[in-house]
């Protein structure tokens, strides 16, 4: 069974983008390539349990096991040594990617306090969109009682679009609530 958001992309977004940007082929229409969730846990240097808890929460949110990221350089000011585990990340592709994006747009973002839409300035110039979330409690999989500390995360939506304008049209078509 195809995902609801993927069907919307194929049936509504592709024809709309083809008409708007005059693509010669359906294959030229931009699509979401992958979504990367990154949770940096700075206090994991002093307490490794914090990193385990963050990785568990990321696994619940994404539906797959996160990769533990390690420090590339030693930074004395942060008491950081090269090779120490300091975060977790997940790369979503295919069905899980569409399921996560659908859940993010329809369930999680509306649960953010004082939400007026996601910022429009977070495109990187190459058609990718980055979004910061201040707390993991907006996701329905996270039980409020089990949370020891609120942690934020970065969500990067990588698209095949060449420009920010094309990428924004794609994400708007998929239901991303941009701020006016």
UniProtKB/Swiss-Prot annotation:
It holds the Pfam family Ribosomal_L5. GO terms for cellular component: ribonucleoprotein complex; ribosome. SUPFAM superfamilies: RL5-like. Keywords: Ribonucleoprotein, Ribosomal protein, RNA-binding, rRNA-binding, tRNA-binding. Gene3D superfamilies: 3.30.1440.10. InterPro entries: Ribosomal_uL5, Ribosomal_uL5_bac-type, Ribosomal_uL5_C, Ribosomal_uL5_CS, Ribosomal_uL5_dom_sf, Ribosomal_uL5_N. PROSITE patterns: RIBOSOMAL_L5. NCBIfam families: PRK00010.1 (NF000585). Belongs to the universal ribosomal protein uL5 family. Part of the 50S ribosomal subunit; part of the 5S rRNA/L5/L18/L25 subcomplex. Contacts the 5S rRNA and the P site tRNA. Forms a bridge to the 30S subunit in the 70S ribosome. This is Large ribosomal subunit protein uL5. It comes from Streptococcus suis (strain 05ZYH33).
């Amino acid at each position: 069974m195809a995902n609801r958001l993927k069907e919307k992309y194929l049936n509504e977004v592709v024809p709309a983008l083809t008409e708007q940007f005059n693509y010669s082929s359906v294959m030229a229409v931009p699509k979401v390539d992958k979504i990367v969730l990154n949770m940096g846990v700075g206090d994991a240097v002093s307490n490794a349990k914090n990193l385990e808890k963050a990785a568990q929460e990321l696994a619940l949110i994404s539906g797959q096991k996160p990769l533990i990221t390690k420090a590339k350089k030693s930074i004395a000011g942060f008491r950081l040594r090269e090779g120490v585990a300091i975060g977790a990340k997940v790369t979503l592709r295919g069905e899980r990617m569409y399921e996560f994006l659908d859940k993010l747009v329809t369930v999680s973002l509306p649960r953010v306090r004082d939400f007026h839409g996601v910022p429009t300035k977070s495109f990187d110039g190459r058609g990718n969109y980055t979004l910061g979330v201040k707390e993991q409690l907006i996701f329905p999989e996270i039980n409020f009682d089990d949370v020891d500390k609120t942690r934020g995360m970065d969500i990067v939506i990588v698209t095949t679009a060449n420009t920010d304008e094309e990428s924004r049209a794609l994400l708007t078509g998929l239901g991303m609530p941009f701020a006016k």
